[in-house]
A protein has these predicted regions:
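Long, highly charged amphipathic alpha-helices
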Residues: 13, 17, 75, 79, ...
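Charge-rich, low-complexity N-terminal segments
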Residues: 1-48, 86-89, 95
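Short N-terminal mixed-charge amphipathic segments
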Residues: 38-67
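Well-ordered alpha/beta subsegment
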Residues: 89-123, 127-143
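Beta-strand-connecting loop/turn residues
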Residues: 34-35, 55-56, 99-101
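Short, internal acidic amphipathic alpha-helical interface segments
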Residues: 59-101
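Residues that form generic nucleotide/phosphate-binding pockets
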Residues: 17, 21, 79-83, 139
């Protein structure tokens, strides 16, 4: 399969490209409801990453932990906004899931991105999520 991006990624073409890539045996992908792909990152403890592809961008995201489990949440929110500069290619957000708010890590890339770039984004998001769950929380607690 070519590394070039198709004219427009679809769920099927994106799943097939991930599966047939050199990393395909380390990323389990499946379709979820709507236009979302669920990727289990095997090298990262089966961390779940969600992918959606639109006309102009591909969004990848993962839930971190419930906001109500974060001590001093207001101070932590300010802390992660300041720490944003040291988290490459990812942005923090808060997502509502079934009435509960979760910290979320998001990456975005052009819909014209080739599969190698998409795979890089998946790896970086997984690494950043693990770092956020441990190192950033520890740095905040120590601060």
């Amino acid at each position: 399969m070519s590394d070039a991006a198709p004219a427009a990624w679809t769920m099927d073409s994106l799943m097939e490209a991930i599966r047939s890539s050199e990393e395909g045996d380390r990323i389990a992908v499946s379709a979820s409801g709507g236009d979302v792909i669920v990727a289990a990152m095997r090298d990262y403890g089966d961390l779940t990453i969600y992918l959606s592809a639109g006309a102009e961008q591909i969004v990848v995201s993962t839930l971190l932990w419930p906001c109500d489990e974060q001590e001093n949440a207001d101070e932590f929110n300010r802390f992660i906004l300041k720490a944003q500069k040291v988290v490459p290619l990812s942005n923090f957000a808060i997502a509502d899931v079934d009435g509960r708010e979760y910290y979320e890590l998001i990456g975005e890339l052009s819909s014209n991105s080739d599969i190698a770039t998409i795979l890089l984004e998946l790896r970086v998001l997984a690494e950043n999520a693990i770092s956020a769950a441990s190192e950033l929380r520890e740095a905040f607690a120590a601060g």
